[in-house]
């Protein structure tokens, strides 16, 4: 069969999508050993993992761009799961970083608005995972700030308030949530090894996030089939019998 004949006889393959929406911790997640890369590897031939991370962004800006990323009427192209991972920038100290700072009440409202928007475009709450910001290692981050010629512009206690707000939004909206801020500090452990500069994730921190996120995500994608048959199961003499239409799975 020619390629044109094959195109006419086979149904289109719809590749399910997992959307990662967040700030720099999401943007950097596709670096070597990043948590997004680990997810993509785990979901090979089941889902495409899309990185929609925007370094430096807060929920005020995220709320504006979300409708440009996921449009109403996408139907079958809608993600099977969405992570919303903001707060590291919203929680900056207003006096030191007014551009990125978002007041706590507005942060909560923005998260809630984004979950409600997803519902309005047929992505139900069961597909959504909120992720709290990780804890801040102030000593390490202060060194980074000094190198940039500024004062310490974040405090872990403030980040914790935003993490609590994220948890409350998840409870109110009925979404899953990963409380990264609490988990990384469980039993008063030294969490500095999870962070590369006091704020962003180290290789160990990426593994930690993946390990705790996967069970939540797996619930949403476990029923999805592996796309196309294993090579050992492809019909040898007439491969199109295996590779077109109902043989996709």
Swiss-Prot record:
Name the EC number(s): 3.1.-.-
Catalytic residues at 24, 197, 200
Superkingdom, taxonomy of origin: Eukaryota
* An annotated GO BP: gene expression
Q: Name one Pfam family in it.
A: Lipase_GDSL
Q: Which CDD domains match?
A: Isoamyl_acetate_hydrolase_like
Keywords from the UniProt entry: Hydrolase, Lipid degradation, Lipid metabolism
Residues annotated with N6-succinyllysine modification: 63
- Site annotation (Transition state stabilizer) points to 56, 89
- Enumerate the InterPro entries for this protein: GDSL, Iah1-like, SGNH_hydro_sf
**Does the UniProt entry include the keyword Hydrolase?**
yes
Q: Which GO terms describe its molecular function?
A: hydrolase activity, acting on ester bonds; identical protein binding
Which family is annotated? Belongs to the 'GDSL' lipolytic enzyme family. IAH1 subfamily.
- Function comment: Probable lipase.
- What name does this protein carry? Isoamyl acetate-hydrolyzing esterase 1 homolog
Origin species: Rattus norvegicus (Rat)
Print the organism lineage: Eukaryota, Metazoa, Chordata, Craniata, Vertebrata
